[in-house]
Regions:
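Basic, Lys/Arg- and aromatic-enriched nucleic-acid-binding interface segment
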Residues: 3-36
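N-terminal core-binding DNA-recognition domain of tyrosine site-specific recombinases/integrases
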Residues: 15-20, 110-112, 134-135
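Basic, alpha-helical nucleic-acid-contacting "clamp/cap" segments
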Residues: 50-107, 119-126
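Mobile genetic element proteins and their domesticated derivatives, centered on retroelements
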Residues: 9, 25, 33, 39, ...
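Short, charged phosphate-coordinating catalytic segments
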Residues: 29-53, 156-160
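Short, basic (Lys/Arg/His-rich) helix/loop patches that form interaction surfaces
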Residues: 92, 117-160, 167, 179
């Protein structure tokens, strides 16, 4: 789920409350490069505002942080504003940021990791992006890592951003891109 695909998916999101949540999900997943379970655990209380218009989210726990030391993840002004707008739209300022909906469009306490895959598949179909393979929660990590690689960001920085502790893990995400790197021999 590269930036180009992210843009296409956001463009098919409706303007209602569900579409607002879906746009937020897409931006949150792409920018943070987190696993589905980690995306679902972000809370409104985790949003931090620092000097010079810098914003971050606290990731309280991850697969590679078994001691719950947490990690500060810088985010864009756009994402910070999206979280604030979402908070106002659902009239909540605590608890899980991403939420599912009941039939009457009131919110449930939290979106589930499995729901992320369902939402991505639905948006992918609406955007007519069936030729790229099935999107899943891992697509955020892969696409953002590929975008960083395309910008010539060093592997070490990509690893830090994505939370990979070993080059082997990071390279698995980037391998498919490297295998088809559009190399042309003249």
């Amino acid at each position: 789920l590269t930036y180009d695909i992210l843009t296409k998916l956001k463009n098919v999101c409706s303007d209602d409350i569900v579409g607002l949540r879906n746009k937020l999900l897409l931006q949150l997943g792409y920018e943070t490069m987190r696993r589905r379970s980690e995306i679902c655990q972000f809370r409104f209380e985790d949003l931090q505002h620092h000097g010079n218009h810098k914003h971050a989210l606290l990731l309280r726990h991850s697969k590679t942080d078994q001691y719950n030391q947490g990690k500060i993840i810088p985010i864009s002004n756009e994402l910070s504003e999206m979280i604030s707008s979402w908070s106002l739209a659902i009239d909540q300022d605590s608890g899980s940021i991403l939420r599912s909906f009941k039939r009457n469009l009131s919110t449930n306490p939290s979106l589930t990791p499995a729901s992320i895959n369902h939402i991505l598949k639905r948006l992918q179909k609406q955007a007519g992006l069936n030729q790229i393979g099935e999107l899943s929660g891992h697509s955020f990590r892969v696409g953002a890592a590929i975008d960083l690689l395309d910008k010539n960001i060093p592997l070490e920085k990509i690893m830090l951003r994505g939370g990979w502790k070993s080059e082997t893990s990071a390279m698995r995400y980037l391998q498919s891109w490297n295998d088809s790197n559009w190399l042309v021999v003249n």
